[in-house]
Amino acid sequence: MGGARPDRIRFNVGGQIFETTATTLANAGRNSFFGVIFDDNWDVLYNEGGFSQSQELFIDRNPDCFAVLLNLLRTGDLNIPPNVSEKSLYREASFYGILDHVRAAKWGQFDGNRLRLSRSVSGRAPGDGTAIRAGPDGGCCVAHGSIVHVYDWMLEEHPPLNLDHQRVNDVGFIDADNIVISACERLGTLDGGMGLFSSTTGELRYKFEVSHINSHENKDRDKGAKKGFTAGALCVNPDDYRIFSSCRGRSNEYGIGVWDQVTGKQMDFFYESPGWSLGDADKLQWLGGVYNCLLVATLFPRKDNCYISLLDFRSRDMVWSWSDIGAPLTLTVVDEKRVRDAVAMEEANSICVVNEYEDLGFMDLRMMMGSRSTSIGSIRWSSRSRLMKGVMPDEPCYPKLAVHGGQLFSSMNDCISVFCGSDWVLTSRLKRSYGGSICDFSIGGDRLFALHSEENVFDIWEVTPPPIIL
């Protein structure tokens, strides 16, 4: 071995000898198991690393898995032989700190126009699911009644979550390790509300509490006392570790609560004003960049009217709002223009809404910031989907909207439509024949998850990784 080349490194893994190059190991990245053998210039630290060029590094791990992972680092291709189980391989990849390489080899970068159905998962919970949320690492969680079922990126189920066994209203990932749940209040107790859980063990780490301190709305109440509340729609701001939730308390204790993700302590509470709706919100979305605001949408049929707002917590002001209050209650308006969902598109400086026939409408935020509109005419509606009339299923699901990577997604019945470009042209449809209408969908971790209403099943859509060009 005295004649070994300077860029060669030898390993003894579980009694089996492997030889590779420093270049191959460097592909694992600085934060991997192999990163410690390189200096800042990516030269091998032979002496400082505790080994010499002629010495084998012993690793007491599975050699069959190591061979697969070494080939992955060398070629970018993941080939798993029959004698290696995927679960064992993923466990070894986690040990070496290269799970991200494995995931990248299994499915490609997200693109709505290249998605393919990967698999479907049937749950064991009774009744229909109510919400599905994608995790940042390719896992997901599904809310069924008072239980949340958690799946990792390998789609193996972890211990289920519940918050005092109260009905779950919303759920979301803080990060790959933490999930927040909002639930209904049990009258006469402090049960329900919000809780933060470990996504792997199911442990309740802490409950979020709400109090109303020195507020004009609560000047005659016990200031600072903990209050029971029903938490609704959730939103996370990853930039400053804030969690937002719509809250329904007693009397006029309705609004948007704000908590610190790390400590669980309440930071703020934005009270709804008379004649408006915040505490019953269906959807919250954080807008960063030039807006730095929270979108709050309360929609039909939760309320008789629709309310969409942008809240600036720095100035504690509602800087923009829209409602269909005062719109003519003709059949045309009621049947065709009821807003069922809304999503802000920061890059396009607009808010997109959808009605029950999947007609899309757009409001330009640049022209309307600082104003309040109560005219349904302020929405520029498309009429792309008029053919949907007359073909609605017996129990249709309300359409849902999402924006990801500059693409717009809209679910309708058992199909998800993909729109692209400045004019939001329909470019793709995602559909399968089993499970019934899609009641919810979510995008994250380079995957799209679709939850069906008629069967306890959800689909996983992925992009097939590009071929390795030799």
Model-derived features: positions:
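N-terminal BTB/POZ boundary and linker segment
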Residues: 1-24
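Canonical WD40 repeat/beta-propeller blade segments in eukaryotic WD-repeat proteins
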Residues: 124-133, 165-176, 213-237, 275-293, ...
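Residue-level marker for isolated small/hydroxyl-bearing positions within beta-strands
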Residues: 143, 182-183, 246-248, 296-299, ...
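Blade-level signature of beta-propeller repeat domains, shared across WD40, Kelch, NHL, RCC1
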Residues: 435-470
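Per-blade loop-tip surfaces of WD-repeat and WD-like beta-propellers in eukaryotic adaptors/scaffolds
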Residues: 150-160, 189-218, 248-278, 287-293, ...
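Short coil/turn segments that connect the beta-strands within blades of beta-propeller domains
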Residues: 137-138, 176-178, 239-241, 290-294, ...
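Canonical BTB/POZ domain core
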Residues: 10, 17, 30-99
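A short helix->beta-strand "capping" segment at the edge of beta-propeller domains
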Residues: 108-128, 151-157, 384-385
